[in-house]
C-alpha cells in the first residue's frame, strides 16, 4: 500500500504523531480539518483525499472521572464518528481499514482461567462501568469492521492495544493525560515529598509505548499481504499500578512517598491480554522496555 494513499484520522494525537515519523507521506487529519461527527464533512474528506487505506485513530477520549460523569456523550459521539468514517470508507471503495480499539473495552470480569484475554472474548461480558459508553462504542466499531470484512472480503480489521504512554501525550490537559504521563507529571511536580494517586495501586496493567503501536499500525498499513484478523497489541508483562509508580520514581531518580486514595475508583482489576496473534503476524517485533520508555517520557514532562 502506497503511503500517499493512506488517510489517518486523529492524526494530530499521540499515536498519530508517532505515525507521522514513520509514514510521513500519508495524510494526517485532526478535528480542526474535518468534523467527523458530520457525515457531509466526512464525505468531503474522502472526496478530497481519495485514500486506499484508512487508519482510524480519532475518538472522544477522557479519564475515569470524565467517563463516569458523561457516558452518553462518549457513547453517542464515538458511535456517530465511527459509523460516518467506516460507512463512507466502504461506500467509496477503500480496500483497507484499520480501526483502533482498546483493551479497556474487554469484559469487566472473567474467570481466572480466561486471562490473558484472547480476541474472541471481546463480547463475553459487558465492559467495566467506568468505561461503559466508550467501551460499547468501540466494540461496535469492531463489529462494523468485522461485518464488512466477513461479507465483502475487504481487509477491514481492528487492532486492540493495551494502555499507552508517550512523550506526545497531553501534558497540559490533566483530563486527557494517560495514566503513566499523569503519574510522571505528579512525580516531577511534587514539592512536599508525596505523590497522590487514585485507587489502591493493586490493579494490573499492560503498558506499551505509543511508538510501538504506531510501528505495528504502519506495518499493517503498508504491507502487501492482507491482515484480515483482529489482534491485541500488548507486551507480556502485567505489573500493578503500584509497581508502575515505583518504576516511575526510579526513572525520575526521586525518593518520594506514593500516597494512594482508596476512596477513588480503581477501574478494572485486571485486563491483561494475549499477544499470540500479534506474534504470529510479526514474530520479530520487540517492545520498548517500560524502564526505557518511562525515562524517555519523564525527560519530556
Give the role of each language-model region.
Residues 4-23:
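N-terminal Rossmann NAD(P)H-binding glycine-rich loop of SDR-like oxidoreductase domains
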Residues 20, 182, 189-301:
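C-terminal substrate-binding subdomain of Rossmann-fold SDR/epimerase-dehydratase oxidoreductases
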Residues 24-45:
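Adenosine-cofactor binding site in Rossmann-like domains, unifying the SAM/SAH pocket
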Residues 40-79, 91, 108-109:
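NAD(P)H-binding glycine-rich loop region in Rossmannoid oxidoreductase-like domains
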Residues 79-85, 137-145:
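Conserved catalytic Lys-bearing alpha helix of Rossmann-like short-chain dehydrogenase/reductases
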Residues 83-131:
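Conserved Rossmann-fold NAD(P)-dependent oxidoreductase catalytic core, especially the SDR/UDP-sugar
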Residues 111-118, 143-219, 247-249:
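NAD(P)-dependent short-chain dehydrogenase/reductase
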Residues 133, 137, 176:
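Active-site helix of classical SDR
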Amino acid at each position: 500500500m502506497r503511503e500517499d494513499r493512506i488517510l489517518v484520522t486523529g492524526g494530530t494525537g499521540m499515536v498519530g504523531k508517532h505515525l507521522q515519523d514513520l509514514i510521513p507521506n500519508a495524510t494526517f487529519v485532526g478535528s480542526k480539518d474535518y468534523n467527523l461527527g458530520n457525515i457531509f464533512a466526512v464525505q468531503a474528506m474522502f472526496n478530497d483525499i481519495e485514500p486506499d487505506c484508512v487508519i482510524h485513530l480519532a475518538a472522544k477520549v477522557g479519564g475515569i472521572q470524565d467517563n463516569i460523569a458523561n457516558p452518553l456523550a462518549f457513547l453517542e459521539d464515538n458511535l456517530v464518528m465511527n459509523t460516518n468514517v467506516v460507512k463512507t470508507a466502504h461506500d467509496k471503495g477503500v480496500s483497507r481499514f484499520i480501526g483502533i480499539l482498546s483493551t479497556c473495552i474487554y469484559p469487566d470480569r472473567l474467570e481466572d482461567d480466561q486471562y490473558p484475554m484472547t480476541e474472541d472474548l471481546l463480547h463475553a461480558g459487558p465492559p467495566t462501568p467506568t468505561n461503559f459508553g466508550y467501551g460499547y462504542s468501540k466494540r461496535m466499531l469492531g463489529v462494523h469492521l468485522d461485518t464488512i470484512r466477513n461479507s465483502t472480503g475487504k481487509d477491514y480489521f481492528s487492532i486492540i492495544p493495551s494502555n499507552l504512554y508517550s512523550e506526545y501525550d497531553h501534558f497540559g490537559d490533566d483530563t486527557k493525560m494517560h495514566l503513566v504521563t499523569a503519574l510522571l507529571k505528579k512525580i516531577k511536580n511534587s514539592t512536599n515529598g508525596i505523590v497522590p494517586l487514585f485507587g489502591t495501586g493493586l490493579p494490573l496493567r499492560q503498558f506499551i509505548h505509543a511508538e510501538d503501536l504506531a510501528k505495528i499500525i504502519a506495518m499493517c498499513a503498508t504491507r502487501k499481504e492482507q491482515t484480515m484478523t483482529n489482534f491485541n497489541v500488548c507486551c507480556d508483562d502485567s505489573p500493578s499500578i503500584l509497581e508502575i509508580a515505583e518504576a516511575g520514581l526510579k526513572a525520575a531518580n526521586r525518593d518520594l512517598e506514593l500516597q494512594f486514595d482508596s476512596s477513588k475508583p480503581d477501574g478494572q482489576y485486571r485486563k491483561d491480554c494475549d499477544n499470540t496473534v500479534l506474534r504470529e503476524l510479526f514474530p520479530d517485533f520487540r517492545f520498548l522496555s517500560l524502564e526505557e520508555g518511562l525515562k524517555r517520557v519523564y525527560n519530556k514532562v
